[in-house]
Amino acid sequence: MEEKRENTNSIYIVPELLEDIFLRLPLKSILKFKTVSRQWRSILESKLFVERRGNLQKHHRKILAAYNCNYFMRPSIFPESRFEGDEEIVYLHCDAAQPSMTCDGLLCITEPGWFNVLNPSAGQLRRFPPGPGPVKGPQENWLLGFGRDNVTGRYKIVRMCFHDCYEFGILDIETGVWSKLRSPPHNMLPGSKSVCVNGSIYWLQISAGYIILAMDLHEESYHGVHHLPATWVTQETQLVNLEDRLAMAMTTNVGPEWILEIWSMDIEGKGWSKGYSWSKSYSISLAHGVGFSWPWQKRWFTPVWVSKQGNLLFYDNHKRLFKYYSGTDEIRCLSSNICVISSYVENLAPLPLKPSHTHHDLGNSNSKFSTSRCHLFPTRGSWISKVLFTSILFGYICLPL
């Protein structure tokens, strides 16, 4: 009799409906709901849910910025985001001077003796050694890359050294294992910024001439992009991922006027028949809205993203964040003191944890990323769980995607 009564009081929701409900919830709630039950956690960490949630969040892009740099604390997310104009900023406690690379909402920060891979959305940090054994040569002589293998979905770190020693390696974040790479066809200068676009990492080399070196993360093969869009590529030219296309941002002068030009690359063909073409996406006059004192002041600009209306968000090397309104041809300064790291999209894919990995959770006990069991949901079938079910069902009915 008691068993019957208990069964009639229980609430069951099919996993497919639960997944649709979870898709509508804010990140903070999703992180808490992972602690309710193994079933909920498996749903929230499933590949299908992560992909569906990621597709929704592509339309809710934010900016990741460094905040209150602290050399003695591990990186941690600021509890609440802020707004500059109508743009949402997510702040990360970290040393902005440390080299960093981003891909799909994940962040790779290098420090002496370690690669730190962070997932700010899931509140996870993994640390990896810089090689399979003792690493030769100083870090300043490394050429680094970080990105996602489009075939396997795995994130990888690339490390190359062309000075003092010749070492070329790739780290699979999934396994934590370093493998050897064959040497690229061109010697590259250390410190060149890398960009990951559609499963390939790109580096811009500027010396006597210029070339873009591309590496396919799945095939571990190299390609050279020799035909660049213009002859005025300089040390200030920035290579970026803009709307899932490789893009170059450069400043040129037409008479007394300075112009920010952004060129985007298209790939034609495959394998040995692969070809590259460039098209000009933006040509923006910097006469109004951006202060200059050329030639004494070196200035370069990095695009962040393009809105649905075609407005461009970009920042410079003097901690200024700008927004260009294409409809009115107007530039507005959103912030004059911000250390932009990159664009930021939510990524719920958990970082793999192997016995060889060093593991940390971001934040502290007061952080929204605390991963201890949430005491709001102590047992399945409790009255609190039933209230929770009722609440999320109400949200499912009332809140649109």
UniProtKB/Swiss-Prot annotation:
CDD domains: F-box_AtFBW1-like (cd22157). Disulfide bonds: none annotated. InterPro entries: F-box-assoc_dom_typ1 (IPR006527), F-box-assoc_interact_dom (IPR017451), F-box-like_dom_sf (IPR036047), F-box_dom (IPR001810), SCF_F-box_component (IPR050796). It comes from the Eukaryota. It comes from Arabidopsis thaliana (Mouse-ear cress). Residues 7-53 form the F-box domain. This is F-box protein At2g43440. Coiled coil: none annotated. PANTHER family: BNACNNG10540D PROTEIN (PTHR31672), F-BOX PROTEIN CPR30-LIKE (PTHR31672:SF13).
